[in-house]
Amino acid sequence: MNDPAANAFAAFLAELGLNCATDLELADTPRRYAALLREWFIQPPRPEVNAVPLPAGGGGPVIIKDLPFHSLCVHHIVPFFGHVHVAYMPAQHIVGFGAVGRLLDWCSRKPQLQERLVVELADALEEVLQPRALLVTCKARQMCMEMTGATSHGHTIAMAARGEWAEQGLEISRVLLAL
């Protein structure tokens, strides 16, 4: 192999007692793993998201539920995955639902903390929308929790609120989380 990352990963596996030269199932793993991480870690520019004027008569809450995502824990480089929910009260603008998904994908394609993921997504949406209120919640399974130590199972929840909902504290978060 002429790929330094693949060579380093093969050496790492060898240190763990896994020989890529003699185990045919592992033979191409270092190359594939290096390619996967390159694809994952090379961050594209933030997607362009254009807000459009709020339609006449609009102005009620916009709720986008169950947006799937996956990312890698920055501490262990193992997956965490789940669903993100976004709710906002438009002031003057809205965005297409697909735009929220593209921003979520952009935020999650790097080693990440769940708590930072919701903050980054909330910041990006707040910048584009300038809403009256915004809430981003994320419910995820953390493989670092499930694969290490006591192998704890369960979900973790992180939230970020902006505008009126941030000023009202966590009560609005609890209500919207129950939707």
Label each PLM-derived region with a short phrase.
Residues 1-179:
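A domain-level signal for the structural core that forms small-molecule/cofactor-binding pockets
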